[in-house]
């Protein structure tokens, strides 16, 4: 009998609670491997660190940091690092678990990990940001490495943060270790195509889902929540395919134009000031009205838990593409399924980022780098192969794409765990 974890008390709609619910749903499809399922309901390792730095005004500030390695049965841990004032251990645990599922779903030789610091980076100077990054890297350095756990960018982190992390780790081990992180600048071993990879993956899976639904992308109405690298890139690619982006929401507010927003003008403004600064391009509406906008495709590409049961009842979308991690709570998932709304789940839909991170890692070890066309061809092939296998599983068992994705991924993870056995 396995005891429940003592250090978290998840609710049904909390990130960890959502993840546990998703795992429970696939147990009937695991056969004899189900005896190992408890392995997926607890992290392998959870590290909490104190991150003290001297601020520009001379005061000493302390920040709380985390690195969680959920499961590494199939390979090194892989997952991003986020800087956000609301980061919690439970959230990082869930994100690391979703990385375990995600890497297995697209059949990459990784496990799942995630990290974060409870900090608002917008309130830090560049010097303070570098200090907190380097101190955090030093604190988690005991468990990360090119063959053990490879961080990457996530919310409020970028290539510069990864460069500082790589340099700090390298200084501590006495040699340049470019493979310790991915999402690096190109001249430090980064990969072409990495910045747009997650958004491209959303487009590739969404295009195939629309085809299977008989939905013509030409003229299709799309609403996008979150307009960073994921949301904006996906929006651009869908617009190029003939779709209309009728609503966009970011941290500043919501803009709507039923005739389609002009992305060529919106994106530069949004990157600098947020979407509400583009007042001439559409109507600024209350944030909750975003969920009432008439659309064919909904792309949640912000944070977790955005599609609640109430919002699932509101949306007119026939297709939901989860660009964010964990954007749909379990009750909302059930409502969408009952309403006949197809959901392409996060653990396959937004796997483009980790796939190109894998390409970067491989290129770093070989010191041989591919051009962007080759990156995109390989990315599209991996995403389509994974989606087709998941779709076949869903059709075979008459289950949702999310449950099918978890069934495929969990079988791979637990088979690896069973074949490796327990030591000692």
Regions found by a protein language model. Name each.
Residues 7-50:
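Short, Gly/Pro- and small/polar-rich lid/capping loops
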Residues 7-14, 209-210, 313-424:
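Adenosine-phosphate binding glycine-rich loop
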Residues 49-121:
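Glycine-rich, N-terminal phosphate-binding loop and its surrounding beta-alpha-beta segment
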Residues 190-294:
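Glycine-rich phosphate/diphosphate-binding loop of Rossmann-like nucleotide-binding domains
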Residues 253-343:
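Rossmann-like adenosine-cofactor binding region
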């Amino acid at each position: 009998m396995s005891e429940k974890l003592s250090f978290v008390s998840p609710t049904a709609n909390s990130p960890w609670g959502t993840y546990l619910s998703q795992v429970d749903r696939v147990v009937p499809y695991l056969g004899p491997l189900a005896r190992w399922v408890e392995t997926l309901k607890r992290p392998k390792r959870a590290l909490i660190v104190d991150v003290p730095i001297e601020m520009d005004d001379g005061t000493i500030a302390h920040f709380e940091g985390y690195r969680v390695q959920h499961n590494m049965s199939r390979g090194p841990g892989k997952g991003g690092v986020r800087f956000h004032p609301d980061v919690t251990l439970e959230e990082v645990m869930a994100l690391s678990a979703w990385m375990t599922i995600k890497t297995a779903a697209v059949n990459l030789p990784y496990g799942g990990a995630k990290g974060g610091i409870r900090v608002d980076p917008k309130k830090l100077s560049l010097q303070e940001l570098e200090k907190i990054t380097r101190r955090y890297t030093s604190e988690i350095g005991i468990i990360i490495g090119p063959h053990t756990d490879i961080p990457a960018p996530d919310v409020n982190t970028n290539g510069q943060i990864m460069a500082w992390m790589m340099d700090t780790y390298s200084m501590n081990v006495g040699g340049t270790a470019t493979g310790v992180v991915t999402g690096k600048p190109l001249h430090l071993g980064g990969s072409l195509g990495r910045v747009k990879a997650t958004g491209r993956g959303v487009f590739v899976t969404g295009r195939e889902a629309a085809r299977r639904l008989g939905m013509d992308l030409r003229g299709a109405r799309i609403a996008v929540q979150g307009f960073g690298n994921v949301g904006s890139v996906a929006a651009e690619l869908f617009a190029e395919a003939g779709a209309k982006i009728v609503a966009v929401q970011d941290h500043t507010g919501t803009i709507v134009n039923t005739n389609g927003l002009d992305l060529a003008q919106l994106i530069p403004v949004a990157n600098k000031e947020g979407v509400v600064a583009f007042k001439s391009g559409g109507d600024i509406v209350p944030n909750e009205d975003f969920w009432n906008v008439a659309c064919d495709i909904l792309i949640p590409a912000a944070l977790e838990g955005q599609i609640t049961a109430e919002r699932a009842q509101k949306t007119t979308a026939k297709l939901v593409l989860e660009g964010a991690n964990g954007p749909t709570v379990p009750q909302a998932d059930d409502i969408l399924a009952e309403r006949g709304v197809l959901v392409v789940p996060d653990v396959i839909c937004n796997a483009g980022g980790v796939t190109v991170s894998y390409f970067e890692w491989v290129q770093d070890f070989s010191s041989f780098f591919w051009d962007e066309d080759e990156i995109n061809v390989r990315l599209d092939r991996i995403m389509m192969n994974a989606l087709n296998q998941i779709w076949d599983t869903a059709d075979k068992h008459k289950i949702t794409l999310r449950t099918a994705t978890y069934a495929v991924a969990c079988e791979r993870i637990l088979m690896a765990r069973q074949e490796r056995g327990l030591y000692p």
